[in-house]
Amino acid sequence: EKREKQLQEWNDIGYETVSHSTVLQAVSVCVNGACSRKDILNKIDKQEFINIWEEIDDDFGKAIDYLKKALGVAVSKLLPYDGLLVPFVYFFHKHPQTPSAIQSKYLKDYFWRCVLTNRFSNALESKLAQDVTHVMDEIIQGNQPQYEQGIDVTYEFLKRNGTFSTGNALIKGLLCLLAGRSPRSFKNDIPVVIDNAWLSQGNSKNYHHFFPK
């Protein structure tokens, strides 16, 4: 019932496509610092889940608001990975206040590192557990996280990995950047409405506002 209410609220703000599993992963990392299937099934009892639900729901709201305003993720279909929402929920669970300027800088850096390195293309659960501990906990303390993997933003990298696909994390990241610049229709110059319905269709005519043929 509470999840249904949450979905109704998320539908109003364009985040209705976030999966049930992402919600469970977020609850688990906030409670246990990990989100494997075993962690979810064996380490969270029913009453604990009920008791923490309202708080986590509020954390989701703060995370979504931040992603919308600071990173241009206007709707959930623009999330490079559904799972990328989880560390941001964890951040706001541990740090309910508005991020400081330095924290916001590191949060944005983390987001783009995930996009440019295809961070969550595999081993999602273990990487989420790593990131809440080694990245988000550091950012909460105002420290710059240390990353093992570098990033590549060369022309060759973008050409090799930038083939248009609605499921491509890099393409979604570029769409976030472009959507934040208030795209307008080539036909009549009215603002382009960005919603999950047309983002789900790879052949949607609206994509030409971003990727002209």
Q: What does each model-found stretch correspond to?
A:
Residues 5-161:
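A cross-family structural signal marking well-folded subdomains
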Residues 119-208, 212-213:
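Intrinsically disordered, low-complexity N-proximal targeting/linker segments that flank membranes
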Residues 1-3:
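Extended alpha-helical scaffolds
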